[in-house]
Amino acid sequence: MATTSLASAFCSMKAVMLARDGRGMKPRSSDLQLRAGNAQTSLKMINGTKFSYTESLKKLPDWSMLFAVITTIFSAAEKQWTNLEWKPKPNPPQLLDDHFGPHGLVFRRTFAIRSYEVGPDRSTSIVAVMNHLQEAALNHAKSVGILGDGFGTTLEMSKRDLIWVVKRTHVAVERYPAWGDTVEVECWVGASGNNGRRHDFLVRDCKTGEILTRCTSLSVMMNTRTRRLSKIPEEVRGEIGPAFIDNVAVKDEEIKKPQKLNDSTADYIQGGLTPRWNDLDINQHVNNIKYVDWILETVPDSIFESHHISSFTIEYRRECTMDSVLQSLTTVSGGSSEAGLVCEHLLQLEGGSEVLRAKTEWRPKLTDSFRGISVIPAESSV
């Protein structure tokens, strides 16, 4: 390929040279010939040889044309060299390594922790962890062939305008991974009562196999036209039933129910929170993880500096729309920065209707073994 292009370029150069006069020189312009006409009769002697300015000018090559041809040759060579060197490169396995467990029902996906997923303490946040869980869950549904038109909807669900909505999520974090780490998310689904679906997750360190995070999420069906909850049709049950496993990552007794909170009992309140276009998912529904961002808006920075979230329970009570205006409320209990903290959260519409309740438990960062580095000074306080 490169040889062919070079030959073509040289042929172009030859054609240009042949277009010149018989001596291979491009004739000068008529204007130049007129200016040199009188000089033809007046020849100078240089070293005993007659010298004509006109003849000398005719013998000079057209350097601009020569430069253009050389540029064409090198451009063609560079292009062909690039084509020969480039080859499609497979995706790194740690980024898109999807596979199933021994029984074909436990889905696994690996994630490399990116620089934009870590914070000032060099570890990931609870939001980054939940993003990995959500991505693994959707790819699980896609891999088993039950992903229809939308996030997590089957074909029969799409026919009936049904979607899954999360009712409750509980996350327990033992350790947060750091930038450059690779984690593996295991996920599987099971039944929860007669009309619910349970999604369970384990997050492991790919190097050690250590369990970093356990999560369970309960979903129910909602009709997108009526915006009301719906029973699971038998046709849908037939689609999802074969993928169910009777196993849990977190037992129900481990989950602590969030407590009621109101304006008078809250320590911190922030209003004026509104959904944006980028907060909506493919189902035209506010992404569940966006609610977590709103909840944490009212947690003081001093807590983030000194503590990690060790567990997170969130109960969704109603959805919000693009024109909703919300308030985030938080109350803190637990004492000094050396001890664990508990926060109760409420997200409500400005009119007072509850959107969700949540509870977060926090442990001091000093108790974490983070590569042998103490990231928070001992004198820090809440």
Swiss-Prot record:
InterPro entries: Acyl-ACP-thioesterase_N, Acyl-ACP_TE_C, Acyl-ACP_thioesterase_NHD, FATA/B, HotDog_dom_sf. The keyword Transferase does not apply. PANTHER family: OLEOYL-ACYL CARRIER PROTEIN THIOESTERASE 1, CHLOROPLASTIC, PALMITOYL-ACYL CARRIER PROTEIN THIOESTERASE, CHLOROPLASTIC. Its EC number is 3.1.2.21. It is found in: Plastid, Chloroplast. Gene3D superfamilies: Hotdog Thioesterase. It comes from Cinnamomum camphora. Plays an essential role in chain termination during de novo fatty acid synthesis. High thioesterase activity for myristoyl-ACP. The gene is FATB1. It catalyses: dodecanoyl-[ACP] + H2O = dodecanoate + holo-[ACP] + H(+). Belongs to the acyl-ACP thioesterase family. It is an enzyme of class 3 (hydrolase). Coiled coil: none annotated. This is Dodecanoyl-[acyl-carrier-protein] hydrolase, chloroplastic.
